[in-house]
Regions:
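Solvent-exposed loop/turn segments at secondary-structure junctions
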Residues: 63, 111-112, 153-156
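Short beta-strand segments enriched in hydrophobic/aromatic residues
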Residues: 47, 59, 109-111
């Protein structure tokens, strides 16, 4: 390859990176409530698809609640629910309240299993925090994750 071709290739790569950077920086800012609603919908869809990892994507490593002291224990429960076959998950439109780097979402969750057996039917309140994350896997950004939840009585299920 000629030296002039190498220079042109490098210039083209640099210009391409600049254009990509400008496009990423100019991406519209999504409101906090919409980010949380999108994550809740993605988790609901993941639940119906038996994708425990997809559900746990919204959960912080610092997660704990009245029943579980870590996301690992939560994963065990979700795996057990998923083993019982297909589930149908309906969720009321969540009410999201954001205060700085914390937020609360409240909605009603109804889960049915085989033969329309009710697996879960309660209101769920989730506590969210804004944590460090990455967009496109490399660009540092803040993401909303669940750190705690109140979801009624699990002992009946």
């Amino acid at each position: 390859m000629k030296p002039s071709s190498k220079i042109m290739l490098r210039v083209a790569l640099v210009l391409g990176m600049i254009v990509l950077g400008v496009l990423l920086l100019r991406a519209p800012v999504v409101p906090d409530q919409v980010q949380i609603l999108d994550q809740l919908e993605a988790a609901r869809a993941a639940g119906e698809a038996h994708n425990v990892n997809g559900i746990l994507r919204i959960v912080s490593d610092k997660y704990h609640d009245a029943y579980f002291s870590s996301p690992v224990q939560l994963r065990l429960l979700l795996n057990k629910v998923q083993e019982n076959g297909s589930v149908r998950i309906t969720q009321s439109i969540p009410v999201v309240t954001v205060k700085g780097d914390t937020a609360t979402s409240t909605s009603h969750l109804h889960i049915t299993g085989a033969e329309d057996r009710v697996v879960y039917d309660h209101d769920v309140t989730m506590q969210w925090v804004r944590e460090d994350g990455a967009r496109l896997g490399v660009i540092p950004t803040k993401v909303w994750r669940v750190v705690s939840a109140d979801y009624g009585n699990l002992l009946g299920y």
